[in-house]
Amino acid sequence: MKILFLVPPESISIESSVPKALEGGKGYYPKLGLMYVAAWYERATGNTPVFIDCPPEGITEHELLEQVEKVQPDMVAMSIMTFNLLDALHTSESLKRRHPNIKICLGGPHVNMYPKETLDQSNIDYVVFGEGEKIFTELITSLEEDISDPQSLQVIKGLGWKKDGISKINQTQTELLDLDELPFPARHLVDVSKYKHIIGEGRQFFSIQATRGCPAACTFCDIRQTKFRYRSPESVVDEIEQLVNMGVDDLFFVDDTITINKKNLIDTCNLIIERGIKINYKISARVDTINEEVLQALKKSGCYRIHFGIESASPRHLKYLQKGQTPEKVERACKMTRKAGIGFFAYMMIGIPHETREEMLATVDFAKNLKPDYAQFSICTPYPKTELYQQMRDEGIVTEDYWQDFAERPRVDFKIQFWNKNFTEQELRKLQDECHARFYSSASYIMKQITKVRSWPDFTAKARMGTKILTSRMGI
């Protein structure tokens, strides 16, 4: 079978809780999850698949159909989040219209939450839920060995399939993969130069993953209290060397909290130093998982920024979100990070249930006092299957399971709902714009950014983002 791994064109994605001013212009991140699946398939079968990533390549629907005509794939595999479900379904319909015999398989975070609901959609033939690397290859191998007997598919855990138009969902695969057994993502199938991010430190950006899972209990997160696993320092640094040889000099570790296992992270940093690898990189971390030893190792090995999930200045709202941290811990961690010579990005949240306008603006002031390189103020949103969503349903704040309804009946007019009883969506969006304007328009912040500009393209990119933030506040 000829396999096409596809990231569909972006045209009807659901609007997120991030402000419109910051949604565009940030660049494109590689789809590592799908690249891992492609790499496992290639290693296991010896066959080289095709990988088309439409957004960074600027590929339109018409151009995609032309490329598919040339490739003539038997199976098209896409990894989807809830935000791009509509894009995936629209693309599936377009492909099936041209090629009725083509098979469509969907995997990814949305499918993990709603496997049957996704499979029930027309034009979808298979779904993979759970860690898809091994499951997808088992699906293809089974189809190739005995395509006349679909019953053979029922033994593959983590697979959904159809028989006579009826959806069949197999048992969940509960055995987790050994991360050191994973092949490196199939970056050789894409044009690495197409991936960029405007607030990086190097010429060529790409992403990498060293861990999976997070033991923290944040109620708004979909991987809340999941098993934390990590790769060996040798495996991670071998991959970094491969990326450097491909021309990459700016990495983002997409791990939710890479700092959970401090010793393993420090060993990884030390190995980067021992091998003399010159790389710029950034990570994400909780404020209660760093110390001076970790920060020193990160700085020496090339880390230039840490993304902290801070959320709020209010102890009661941090408790409501089950963050497990306090404003004092946040201040201490940010101070240590600055002292170590590492920048940081502050992820903040407004519109938390029962939060007042005064508390939201206090969170902005708190963020300004922390002196981060950047801050983002998202509107608190109960995403599907999260503890926050269930908690808000239990409190009667959310009166209907609208995410379930969307999973069953995806529609273009669907809008994310924010749930603070004291504010309308329009009021929250306006407050969000005001928060960003208050943070980014301060004289001290502007002067700090001017002194850090590395080049004219860097200046113009940041200026465009700043202009978007300010004009959004003025309603332009």
Task: Set out the residue ranges of the language-model regions.
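Mobile, glycine-enriched helix-loop/loop "lid" segments at the mouths of ligand-binding/catalytic clefts
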Residues: 173-192, 388-411
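N-terminal [4Fe-4S]-dependent radical SAM core
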Residues: 1, 9-18, 156, 161-210
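Catalytic cores of alpha/beta
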Residues: 115-120, 294, 354-369
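Glycine-rich beta-alpha loop elements in corrinoid/cobalamin-binding modules
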Residues: 33, 40-41, 48-178, 379-385
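Radical SAM [4Fe-4S] cluster-binding motif and immediate context
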Residues: 180, 184-347, 352, 365
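Radical SAM enzyme core and accessory elements
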Residues: 3-5, 12, 46-48, 65-69, ...
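Short catalytic helix/loop segments, enriched in acidic residues and glycine
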Residues: 20-41
